[in-house]
């Protein structure tokens, strides 16, 4: 029950356990899958790491100068030189200065002067390449076991952790007591790593444009440089003052860390953990659940009394969680659970924790269920010790329909075409079709539920014809669009 504590939660239900199921996992969200005769599973991406990114360039933002040396010549005596000029670790500058009788020269005029100083970088930052094949995704899969300590648990101890990389995109997770689930995932970071550089400065990192980083007016070293001393463009952090006869002062600029922090305002900051860089993004995965099995399906039904350990309440997803305790004998056993209408004639709602079981007497069990909108009764156990609980779920199916549609529209606005992967239940939708299904699929399903596909096609044709014959331009365009969407969704649903 890991997903209970996460606000952004998707449900994938009604899928055959023997088929591939398409889901999309993103940071900050959780996906719950439910299939017939299969355990309910929660999937969450908890971490995306960039392993061993290659260094493109190092840039120095704080330096110091030592061992300053100056050599000068009188007019007409040639250009001065220093042996230190051959050392690439030094920064040097040639200048001209006024000379004459007052400073040791027999002639008046311009004499040469050269000054060198040892340049040492104290602090630097690195720009790193990140290749998609270096990304590692950590996924936690947690079955709905009903155990008390597993509700909303974020430690990873009660789920199975999987490491997904482009090199090992197909992996299997062994869930103790439930069998094996197979995952085939492909990363969708939404980033163009050819144009992006990871700028790492001390214990912080940012995503910046590659060309912006290369244009920084700071001393730099190639990423392949192993000596770390032969800085290029050292003069960008050094100022040579005006020379006076045989003397010239050279100073180094102060730390540029503050200027860099200001320049990076608004850039996407990347978190770091144990030297690895943590990314966002999402994974498109296909699940195969044919090797999964329900735990305790052969157990008999519990015949004793149950009691409510903690008052049940509605979660932020519209579901409810009930904590009960079995006081009877015969454990382990299955917990009888159903949701019925007020007349007690029809079974309603959906049990998310499939086949909840009691492993031992007096041990609390958590059950998650999705009751229908309005009034209903929750029945736990069998007579004579049966629990009958009244529940009122606020809202309506129409409101939920529009809420789901708005969620799909927001995803498309934020993520672009990558959002078309969300909400896929194994159907084949491509290009614009995925967008139409994502945004309008819920409304369409509610409006035309129970209508045959031929009638849907006919309605779409009629609406399109009316729009084409309308004299009002705005009405014509609106009706044609509605008709085309109706035709498309009608054809896709039938297919």
UniProtKB/Swiss-Prot annotation:
Does the keyword field hold Disulfide bond? yes
Q: Which domain of life is it from?
A: Viruses
What are the TM regions of this chain, as residue ranges? 446-466, 473-493
Asked if Zinc is a keyword of the record, the answer is yes
Print the keywords alphabetically: Clathrin-mediated endocytosis of virus by host, Cleavage on pair of basic residues, Disulfide bond, Fusion of virus membrane with host endosomal membrane, Fusion of virus membrane with host membrane, Glycoprotein, Host endoplasmic reticulum, Host membrane, Host-virus interaction, Inhibition of host innate immune response by virus, Membrane, Suppressor of RNA silencing, Transmembrane, Transmembrane helix, Viral attachment to host cell, Viral envelope protein, Viral immunoevasion, Viral nucleoprotein, Viral penetration into host cytoplasm, Virion, Virus endocytosis by host, Virus entry into host cell, Zinc
Q: What would you give as a GO molecular function for this chain, any one?
A: protein dimerization activity
Cystine links in this protein are 3-30, 60-121, 74-105, 92-116, 185-285, 302-333
Question: Quick one: where's region Fusion peptide?
Answer: 98-111
Fetch the InterPro entries from UniProt: Flav_gly_cen_dom_subdom1, Flavi_E_Ig-like, Flavi_E_Stem/Anchor_dom, Flavi_E_Stem/Anchor_dom_sf, Flavi_Glycoprot_E_cen/dimer, Flavivir/Alphavir_Ig-like_sf, Glycoprot_cen/dimer_sf, Glycoprot_E_dimer_dom
Cellular component GO terms held in the UniProt record: host cell endoplasmic reticulum membrane; membrane; viral envelope; viral nucleocapsid; virion membrane
Residues in the Extracellular compartment per record: 1-445, 494-495
Point out the glycosylated residues in this chain: 67, 153
A biological process from GO: symbiont-mediated suppression of host innate immune response
Q: Which residues lie on this side of the membrane: Cytoplasmic?
A: 467-472
Something else known? Isolate M3 comes from a patient with dengue fever.
| Record protein name field | Genome polyprotein
């Amino acid at each position: 029950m890991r997903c209970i504590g996460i606000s952004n939660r998707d449900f994938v239900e009604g899928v055959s356990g023997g088929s591939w199921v398409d889901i999309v996992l993103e940071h900050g969200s959780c996906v719950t899958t439910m299939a017939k005769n299969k355990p309910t599973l929660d999937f969450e991406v908890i971490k995306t790491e960039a392993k061993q990114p290659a260094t493109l360039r190092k840039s120095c933002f704080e330096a110091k100068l030592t061992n300053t040396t100056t050599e000068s010549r009188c007019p007409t005596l040639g250009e001065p030189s220093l042996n230190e000029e051959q050392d690439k670790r030094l920064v040097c500058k040639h200048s001209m200065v006024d000379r004459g009788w007052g400073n040791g020269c027999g002639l008046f005029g311009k004499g040469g002067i050269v000054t060198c100083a040892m340049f040492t970088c104290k602090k630097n930052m690195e720009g790193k390449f990140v290749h998609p094949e270096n990304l590692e995704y950590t996924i936690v899969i947690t079955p709905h076991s009903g155990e008390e300590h597993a509700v909303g648990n974020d430690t990873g101890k009660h789920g199975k952790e999987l490491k997904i990389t482009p090199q090992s995109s197909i992996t299997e997770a062994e869930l103790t007591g439930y069998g094996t689930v197979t995952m085939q995932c492909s990363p969708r970071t939404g980033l163009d790593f050819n144009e992006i550089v990871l700028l790492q400065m001390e214990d912080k990192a940012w995503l910046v444009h590659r060309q912006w980083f290369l244009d920084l007016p700071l001393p730099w070293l190639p990423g392949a440089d192993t000596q770390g001393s032969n800085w290029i463009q050292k003069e960008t952090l050094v100022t040579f003052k005006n020379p006076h006869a045989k003397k010239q002062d050279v100073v180094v600029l102060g730390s540029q860390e503050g200027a860099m922090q200001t320049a990076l305002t608004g850039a996407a900051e990347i978190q770091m953990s144990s030297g690895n860089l943590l990314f966002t993004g999402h994974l498109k995965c296909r699940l195969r659940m044919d090797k999964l099995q329900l735990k305790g399906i052969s157990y008999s039904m519990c015949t004793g009394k149950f009691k409510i350990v903690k008052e049940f309440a509605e979660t932020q997803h519209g579901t409810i969680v009930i904590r009960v305790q079995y006081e009877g004998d015969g454990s382990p056993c299955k917990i009888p659970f159903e949701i019925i209408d007020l007349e007690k004639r029809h079974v309603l709602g959906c049990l998310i924790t499939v086949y909840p079981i009691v492993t031992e007497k007096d041990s609390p069990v958590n059950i998650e269920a999705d009751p229908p909108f309005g009034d209903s009764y929750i029945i736990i156990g069998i007579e004579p010790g049966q629990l009958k609980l009244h529940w009122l779920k606020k809202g309506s199916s129409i409101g939920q329909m529009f809420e789901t549609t708005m969620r799909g529209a927001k995803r498309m606005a934020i993520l672009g075409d990558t959002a078309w992967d969300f909400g896929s239940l194994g159907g084949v939708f491509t290009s614009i079709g995925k967008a139409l299904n994502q945004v309008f699929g819920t409304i369409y399903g509610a409006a035309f539920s129970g209508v045959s596909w031929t009638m849907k096609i006919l309605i779409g044709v009629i609406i399109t014809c009316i729009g084409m014959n309308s004299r009002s331009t705005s009405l014509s365009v609106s009706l044609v669009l509605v008709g085309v969407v109706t035709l498309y969704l009608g054809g896709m649903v039938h297919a």
